[in-house]
């Protein structure tokens, strides 16, 4: 099975297992590290996840992956929290983390409300309306970024 097909199939199975445990799949990676393939999942829930949550996901998902035989080669399974710089991937994430400091990178330069074009936006997430991510920038301007133009978005740690 091609890598993209493995990722797609594992994502479906992982989302089923993780949601049944009251958590959400934030991100999934399947890549070679050294001589070994690593399947890394990042999970979260309201209030955050702990070691027992990660162990439960690992145990349950391992059983499902073994039965479904999705990955034919040897791999390591890692399950962890997304960390303080959690990626924002879904439309719902941009509403859920409203009020938090975010860093957003876009596929192409976009203007802020002062007309300055940039690809990196850092500021307070104001939410998402009609598919447009709203950010109050650190420099005082505002930005309205179409969701489909977001290449990468992460929460930023505030000191």
UniProtKB/Swiss-Prot annotation:
Annotated protein name in UniProt: Ribosome maturation factor RimP
Keyword vocabulary terms for this entry: Cytoplasm, Ribosome biogenesis
Family indicated by similarity: Belongs to the RimP family.
Biological process annotations from GO: ribosomal small subunit assembly; translation
InterPro entries linked to this entry: Ribosome_maturation_RimP, RimP_C, RimP_C_sf, RimP_N, RimP_N_sf
Keyword Cytoplasm applies: yes
UniProt keyword annotation of Cytoplasm present: yes
Protein's cellular compartments: Cytoplasm
Gene3D superfamilies: Ribosome maturation factor RimP, C-terminal domain, RimP-like superfamily, N-terminal
Superkingdom assignment: Bacteria
Gene encoding the protein: rimP
Function: Required for maturation of 30S ribosomal subunits.
Pfam families in alphabetical order: DUF150_C, RimP_N
Family matches, as NCBIfam families: PRK14647.1
Primary location recorded for the protein, binned into one broad class: cytoplasm
GO cellular component, one term: cytosol
């Amino acid at each position: 099975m091609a890598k993209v097909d493995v990722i797609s199939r594992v994502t479906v199975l992982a989302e089923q297992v993780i949601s049944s445990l009251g958590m959400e799949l934030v991100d999934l990676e399947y890549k070679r590290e050294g001589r070994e393939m690593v399947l890394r999942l990042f999970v979260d829930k309201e209030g955050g996840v702990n070691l027992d949550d990660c162990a439960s996901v690992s145990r349950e998902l391992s059983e499902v992956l073994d039965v479904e035989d999705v990955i034919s080669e040897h791999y390591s399974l890692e399950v962890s929290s997304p960390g303080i710089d959690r990626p924002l991937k879904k439309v719902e994430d941009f509403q859920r983390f409203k009020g938090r400091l975010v860093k957003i990178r876009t596929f192409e330069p976009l203007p802020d409300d002062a007309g300055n074009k940039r690809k990196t936006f850092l500021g307070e997430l104001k939410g998402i309306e009609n598919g447009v991510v709203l950010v109050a920038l650190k420099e005082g301007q505002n930005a309205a970024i179409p969701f489909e133009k977001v290449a990468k978005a992460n929460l930023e740690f505030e000191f």
